[in-house]
Amino acid sequence: RDPDAIEVQAAAAAYVSDDLELARDRVRWFPALVSNHVVDLINKYPKDDLPESLWKYVENREGYDYLHHAEVGSDNARFVSDEITDSFAVVGPVSAHRERLDALREAGVTQFNVYLMNGEEEDQLDVYGREIIGA
C-alpha cells in the first residue's frame, strides 16, 4: 500500500462559544471518556514506557460510571482539568476552532469528525457549517 495515499482523520468534542468556561463544561465528558483507553494502556504497558502527560491526567480518576457515558455534566469528568479539556477538545470562539483545524490540516489531517454530544447539537453544527467550514 502506498503510504502517501493514506489519509488521516481526527475526532474530538467541540463547542463554539466566547464563554470558554461554558465551552469546557460542555465537552469535559470527552477527555473523561478517553481516560478509559488511557487506563487500558496503563494496565497493559509499564508506566515508564508511556508519556508522563498521558498517565498523569488520570491519576485522580476515581472510576467511570458507564450509566453516564458521554454525558454533559457527568461526575465522570470531575478529575478532568481545564488544561486537559483544552488539549483533548476544540473549545472557544470561532477563531479558536479555525486555528485548531488549520493546525490539524498542517499536521496532515484530511478529515475532522466533530463529536457533538453537548446538548446543543443543532446550533453547534449550524455554527460549524456556516462560520468555520463554510468560511
Predicted regions: what is each one?
Residues 17-18, 119-123:
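Flexible loop/turn segments at secondary-structure boundaries
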Residues 1-106:
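An alpha-helical appendage that flanks or caps ligand/catalytic pockets
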Residues 116:
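Residues that line or immediately flank small-molecule/substrate-binding pockets and catalytic motifs
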Residues 121-135:
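C-terminal helical cap(s) of enzyme catalytic domains, especially alpha/beta-barrels
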